[in-house]
C-alpha cells in the first residue's frame, strides 16, 4: 500500500464517489426482469439477492414493482466515501467484529481482535496485537511487536493536514484503556500503564502512568517480566 499523507487522504475522501451500498432480498417474477449492469444479482426464477448503490437500486425497485412481490433491504452506510478493507490480502490474524477501513497497512503476523476500529491511513507493524475495542485514529502508526491494550485510543489526525500523527515505536506495551493524544511519539520499549492519558512524548524504555501520564521509572527486568509478549499468540 502506498503511504498516504494527510493531504492525500483528504483528497481521497473528498473526491471519492459517495456510496450507499444495499443488499436486497427479493422475490417475485424475477425471470421477467432485466437487471442493469450496475446491480449485481444472484437470482433464481422467483427469489434472489441483489447488491448495488441505493441510487441505482431504488429506481430499479420502483420501475419493476409490478413484477416484485416483496423485498427486504439491508444497509449499513450512507454516502460513504471510504469502503471497508479487503481483509483477505493480509498475512495476519483478524478476528470477527474488527472494523478496518480502506488504505490501512497491517504487518505480517499482526493480530487484530474483536471490536477494534482502525481508521484510514493507520499503520500496524509485524507481530503487533491490537486488542479488543482499541481505536486507531486516522494515520496512527504502531511499530513492530507491540501490544495495544483493550479499549485504548490512539488519537487520529486527518485534519488539519499539518497535524502530526501518533507514533508508537517497536516493542511498546500499552495497558487497557490508555489514551495517546495526537502528535505524541512513544519511544521503543516504553510501557504505558492502564488508564494513562499520554499528552507528551515518552522516552524509549520508560514507564509512564497517570492522568496526565508522568514518568514512573525506567523499564527494568521486573517490568519486562510483567509485560512480556507471547509470540505463540501471533502464529498464523
Swiss-Prot record:
Biological process terms in GO annotation: diaminopimelate biosynthetic process; lysine biosynthetic process via diaminopimelate
Molecular function terms from GO: tetrahydrodipicolinate N-acetyltransferase activity
Catalytic activity as recorded in UniProt: (S)-2,3,4,5-tetrahydrodipicolinate + acetyl-CoA + H2O = L-2-acetamido-6-oxoheptanedioate + CoA
Organism superkingdom: Bacteria
Pathway: Amino-acid biosynthesis; L-lysine biosynthesis via DAP pathway; LL-2,6-diaminopimelate from (S)-tetrahydrodipicolinate (acetylase route): step 1/3
Statement: the UniProt record of this protein carries the keyword Amino-acid biosynthesis: yes
A Pfam family: Hexapep
Top-tier EC class: transferase
Stored CDD domains: LbH_THP_succinylT
Keyword Lyase recorded: no
Keywords, comma-separated and alphabetical: Acyltransferase, Amino-acid biosynthesis, Diaminopimelate biosynthesis, Lysine biosynthesis, Repeat, Transferase
Signal peptide: none
EC number assigned by the record: 2.3.1.89
UniProt record similarity statement: Belongs to the transferase hexapeptide repeat family. DapH subfamily.
Role description: Catalyzes the transfer of an acetyl group from acetyl-CoA to tetrahydrodipicolinate.
Protein name: 2,3,4,5-tetrahydropyridine-2,6-dicarboxylate N-acetyltransferase
Organism from which the protein derives: Lactobacillus helveticus (strain DPC 4571)
